[in-house]
């Protein structure tokens, strides 16, 4: 799975649910095989029924299967799901060229980011203090709202000096 912002369509809730159902049926959601696993034999698909005698053997098989890591995803499944898009996830047959940004936080140079930011000076990008005022143009010049939220009268002229 590779992260990118290149989208081909709009992802709807129904299409995402359909995709998750496909993943569950393929047995790759949460690295588990569904409880009533479909077994294939000679190209025919049959559903295995549990009996009391074979329940313990089947449970140990299912437990063993549920902990097996999924090594790869079928390329055909990826081709079918190309129409699903997300700003954060792209299903791709190719492995990513570099690790996702989350892995970069484990590097030692990034761990000391807080103290480095303090030395560099304050950055207010994307941050707002509780006391920030809201600036707006006064268009009618007769009334406005001050920083405390009170309605005030705006003077048209301010005379300075002796009048």
Swiss-Prot record:
One of its GO terms (molecular function) is nerve growth factor receptor binding. Residues 1-3 form the signal peptide. Its main location: secreted. The keyword Secreted applies. Residues 4-119 form a propeptide. Pfam families: NGF, NTF3_N. Glycans are attached at residue 112. PROSITE patterns: NGF_2 (PS50270). It comes from Eryx colubrinus colubrinus. This is Neurotrophin-3. It comes from the Eukaryota. Seems to promote the survival of visceral and proprioceptive sensory neurons. GO terms for biological process: cell surface receptor protein tyrosine kinase signaling pathway; modulation of chemical synaptic transmission; negative regulation of neuron apoptotic process; nerve development; nerve growth factor signaling pathway; neuron projection morphogenesis. The keyword Secreted applies. GO terms for cellular component: axon; dendrite; extracellular space; synaptic vesicle. Belongs to the NGF-beta family. Keywords: Cleavage on pair of basic residues, Glycoprotein, Growth factor, Secreted, Signal. It is found in: Secreted.
